[in-house]
Amino acid sequence: MERRSFLKATGSAAAAAALAGCSSDSDSDGTEDEAGTGDGMDSTDSSGGDVGTDLKEDGDLWRVNTGTMTTMDPIEATDTQSGIVIQQMFDPLMNYPNSQPAVEGLMAADYEVSDDFTTYTFQLKDATFHNGDTVTASDFVYAFERLTASDNSSRAYFVLDSLGVTHETTTETVDGEEQEVYEPGTLGVTAVDETTLEIQLDAPFASTLEMLAYSSFSPVPEGMVGDIEGYDGEVSQGEFSSSNPIGNGPFEFDTWDSGTEARVSAYDDYYGESPNVDGVHFAVIENDSANYNYAMNRNADIFELPTAQYDPGKVSVEEEDDQGRQIGTYGELRNGATANYSGVSNIGVFYLGFNMASVPKPVRQAVAYAMNQHTVVEQVFKQRGEPAYNFTPKSIFPGGAQNYNDRAENEYPYGYDDSQLGQARSVMEEAGYGENERVAIELTIYESGVWSETASILRDQLQSVYIDLEVNQAPFNTLLERGRNGELEMYSLGWVADWPAPDNFLQLLNPPQTDTSLDFPISYVNWQPENGDAAQQAEEAYQSIADNPAPTEDAQATRNEAYIEMENANWEDVAMLPVYHELTELFWYDHVDFTPPAGMGPSRQKMNTVSLGERE
């Protein structure tokens, strides 16, 4: 079976949820991989005073998570906020150092790749888990099997589809239909000896090493959780995921009070660079005002600024480094301090998605004509990003950022830096709509002030083109659940890179993986052949990507052509309307010695190298 065709053949796709791959929209954080976040449910009042401070210690690094964490189990997490904490406790084979998009070995001391790019052999570093057990290759085998076979895994497709690890299938009846599903215990991941791990792929995959930097692939002590065949488990998965996660990272679990705070403490026997802080404390604050007040009261060392309280005129950029990070200062703040500042273009995209089973094509196109991405970024997001006209971010776009810009300016069919309401009205009238034949559409947004303002602008514009847009907000997790159940018509979400390649983004536009009748659709747009030729074009292009996975120039050229085909198909049918590419901005006080994250975002950064001076 061809790699990446497995999901189609089995009729199942894994739940993919921005974070990783995960990210934030400047108001707060909540990419699920389908990403989104907002200023949602309060964990405090707007004072931002004492929320999440019970566990704080003076020697801790104080952070804010702007969304609710859902799990501490690496195979289960799909949201950015959980990923930020998991990143501190679990070390996979590879790593994005300070979120730079070029990977380095982490648990891997060395590795070899076969001439046909299908066998990867890793030598492991000498490390221990937080319970004192030595990390062995068998622990990785067990962790990969959990990721693939556990009912608690949200990322089985990472192994079977994205990487394409060799495996066998068996026939099972699912909902009255026979399907080929993974046969437990057949995965091509082998412990050659205690410190040598071998991974066998069905076919080459150009982003294998980048994929293995994802925390889902982190080792877990063999037999710790009994949620796969052959293991009874020392703890239940519920306990492991909430109160007893055992990892191998620079910090170990201390405690977690869902919706309020979490803390990890420095692990004394860490094999790498020992943490410079006693621990990291995360206050969970989803409300923008509370988040801002918390930081202004100096309860956070490193923080974000909600867009409502952000003034672009207070940014002073002093340098731009080789990772594209703009470094400088911001201030002064409300509390009189001048903060350190960093801004970097995130490898991600925020967009409006359409359930094509319920929103007709003329309506989708009319929304695209009405949307002026430049206006949204400048007036609503206060220039904290770049207008998005392609789904793939600029830094990884085929042909580079210049090709991205050229396509946007010269080929985007719905108006570059222009709201074309006349065209929107025409396409609706041609489809039979008018003042006496209006259409009502529900737009569900995650709880975010900036998305609420964007939706209001769009709603007012669409009134004149016979579309009555009803805007409703939902907590992030509720929005995702409704999406997976096919209950959304139009929605706001985002996606940030699991690995820095276009196929990681364009998989959301692979029609078979958008079917919400599946258990875990990767996106919620229901792009089916009955929608027209563009769906077939997108599906064939994605299959071309899957058929040419090798890290060679010829295969890359073929993939690049297919990437553009998928972008064009999305332009035609408007399955997803790109809105903006986020600028990740962080702020920190002078007592913090901190290298800010690069393009892979905060959820990929470990905090063991951060140092603290004396707080004011």
Language-model-detected regions and their locations in the chain:
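Long beta-strand-rich cores associated with HINT superfamily self-processing modules
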Residues: 586-616
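Ligand-site clamp/hinge motif
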Residues: 239, 263-326
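Append "and occasionally in soluble cytosolic enzymes with long acidic Gly/Pro-rich linkers
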Residues: 359-460, 465, 565, 614-616
